[in-house]
């Protein structure tokens, strides 16, 4: 399909809303050879965009499980990655991404229960700051780029082990050279959870 598209005059391409597979973006990049390509990330609560990553198709493309990096925060925004005990993780360690800054919402209108679940006050750089809990599993690499591993609610626990369904999907796609894959948990007749994979 991409072979039929030629958009040499396009100057900018911004990817948003969903995690972007590197192999698909490489193909798309051939259709827009003169465009700068950016991957933007952000939940609605952060007024949609809070981080960005400029993709260099002629260089190394940062990714996690085949999905593009979400980059670094825009000016005026802060991101932190915390563990289950609300401690900042070391670079290279996975945790939940939190965002803060002027464009992050003050909260949900007249919904204190939801606000209590979605926001935390955190001592960051000497200031107690309000952060939004994204629910996204990420890590920060040595270059301060944020790598996205999927939703925490897409992570499952089976027999005491945390399993990232997105990682299973990535390896399935990689084994056949692309395409789609979906991993999910189902209950067997004996009521024990098992993982199924369709690709």
Where are the model-predicted features located?
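AMP-dependent adenylate-forming
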Residues: 33-39, 54-199
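Gly/Ser/Thr-rich phosphate-binding loop
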Residues: 1-69, 78
């Amino acid at each position: 399909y991409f072979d039929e598209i030629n958009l040499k005059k396009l100057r900018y391409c911004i990817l948003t809303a969903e995690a972007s597979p590197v192999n698909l973006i490489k193909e798309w990049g051939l259709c827009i050879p003169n465009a700068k390509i950016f991957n933007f990330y952000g939940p609605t609560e952060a007024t949609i965009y809070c981080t960005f990553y400029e993709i260099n198709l002629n260089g190394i493309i940062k990714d996690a499980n085949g999905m593009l990096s979400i980059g670094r925060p825009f000016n005026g925004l802060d991101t932190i990655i915390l563990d289950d005990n609300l401690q900042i993780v070391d670079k290279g360690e996975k945790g939940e991404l939190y965002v803060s800054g002027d464009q992050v919402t003050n909260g949900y209108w007249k919904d204190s229960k939801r606000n209590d679940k979605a926001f935390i006050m955190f001592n960051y750089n000497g200031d107690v700051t309000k952060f939004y809990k994204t629910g996204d599993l990420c890590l920060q690499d040595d270059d301060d780029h944020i790598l996205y591993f999927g939703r925490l609610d897409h992570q499952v626990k089976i027999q005491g082990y945390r399993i990232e369904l997105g990682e299973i999907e990535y390896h399935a796609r990689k084994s056949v050279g692309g395409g789609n894959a979906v991993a999910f948990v189902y209950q067997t007749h004996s009521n024990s959870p098992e993982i199924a994979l369709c690709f």
